[in-house]
């Protein structure tokens, strides 16, 4: 927020040439006086073309097409479709809660080949436990999949800054990726474990979060929906998050976790890629950082920021 169209496109370019793949508008970014939508699309296209030429790798941008009315939403979609992007290099981000389910379904039916990115801004009004008549993150995620979303934010499973328990977020992610469910929650073995056996209770609750729980819940006719993870993550938290999720079948979008790198966005993207490489090679990021300066700088910066936050925490 706050960048002009060309400045925003420059940040996209820096992320892409740093090794990143997927850039998104955030939920409040649309058509602004200082960042007109048409110019933003134009400059992002130029930045993407340059990054693809330099890296030899495909890149993706998710454009926020949310609008106060139907005509404007479609106008933005058509602007992107006609901008000359390669197929598969753009997505439509829709604020599904505020724009409404009709907007999500309209995008899916009009643009069957486009990745529909469901941003869940304002979901907390429904999914937080403080609301006695709301619904869970699992229900929201399944609604989004049913409406045709290709991906939806599912939370950070207790690792990032987003509210939500690991069990809640993992269950949502697992369910929108599944095609068929069998076995009701109350028939699972963990339901009969004595409550005073904490070790076993913890084990089976973790197992529960990673398995399908709804019996009459076949999704064989529905395409999978990709979990999108964002909110308070950075390169030092990538492995802890993957360990909790027990898999890498997700998209992660890091804002400050990338742009706040001491050397800027390009170095932040490189640090994230290096953290991923370390995980794939089963090397700790501390060891991998000895030969990868961007990752070393990220570890130093985010570790310092974490310690400062703990010192300033009024609970301490």
Model-derived features with residue positions:
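Active-site-proximal, glycine-rich beta->alpha crossover segments in alpha/beta enzymes
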Residues: 1-20, 27
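Aromatic/hydrophobic pocket-lining residues that form the small-molecule binding cavity
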Residues: 8, 37, 41-44, 73, ...
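Conserved, mostly hydrophobic/aromatic
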Residues: 15, 241, 272
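Glycine-rich, proline-tolerant flexible connector loops at the mouths of alpha/beta enzymes
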Residues: 20-42, 156-163
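Flexible, glycine/charged-enriched surface loops at secondary-structure junctions
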Residues: 22-27, 31, 51-58, 185-193, ...
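N-terminal active-site wall of soluble small-molecule enzyme domains
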Residues: 52-61, 68-81
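Catalytic alpha/beta core domains of metabolic enzymes, predominantly
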Residues: 75-77, 84-254, 263, 267
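Extended, intrinsically disordered, low-complexity segments
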Residues: 165, 187-206, 265-316
């Amino acid at each position: 927020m706050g960048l002009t169209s060309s400045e925003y496109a420059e940040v996209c370019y820096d992320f892409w040439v740093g090794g990143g793949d997927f850039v998104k508008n955030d939920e409040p970014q649309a058509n602004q006086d200082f960042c007109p939508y048409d110019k933003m699309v134009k400059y992002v296209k130029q930045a993407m073309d340059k990054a693809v030429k330099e890296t030899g790798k495909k890149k993706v941008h998710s454009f926020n097409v949310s609008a106060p009315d139907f005509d404007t939403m479609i106008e933005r979609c058509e602007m992107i479709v006609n901008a000359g992007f390669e197929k598969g290099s753009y997505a439509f981000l829709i604020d599904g809660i505020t724009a409404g389910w009709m907007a999500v379904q309209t995008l899916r039916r009009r643009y069957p080949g486009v990745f529909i990115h469901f941003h869940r801004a304002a979901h907390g009004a429904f999914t937080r436990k403080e609301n006695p008549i709301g619904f869970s993150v699992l229900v929201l995620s399944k609604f989004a999949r049913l409406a045709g979303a290709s991906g939806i934010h599912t939370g950070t499973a207790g690792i990032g800054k987003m509210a939500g328990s690991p069990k809640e977020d993992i269950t949502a992610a697992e369910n929108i990726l599944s095609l068929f469910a069998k076995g009701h929650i109350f028939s699972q073995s963990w339901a009969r474990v004595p409550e005073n056996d904490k070790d076993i209770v913890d084990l089976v609750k973790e197992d529960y979060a990673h398995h399908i729980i709804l019996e009459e819940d076949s999704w064989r006719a529905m395409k999978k929906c990709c979990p999108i993870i964002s909110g308070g993550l950075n390169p030092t938290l990538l492995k802890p998050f993957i360990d909790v999720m027990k898999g890498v079948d997700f998209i992660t979008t890091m804002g400050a976790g990338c742009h706040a790198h001491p050397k800027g966005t390009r170095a932040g993207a490189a640090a994230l890629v290096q953290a991923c490489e370390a995980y794939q090679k089963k090397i700790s990021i501390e060891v991998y950082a000895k030969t990868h300066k961007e990752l070393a700088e990220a570890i130093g910066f985010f570790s310092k920021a974490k310690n400062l936050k703990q010192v300033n925490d009024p609970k301490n």
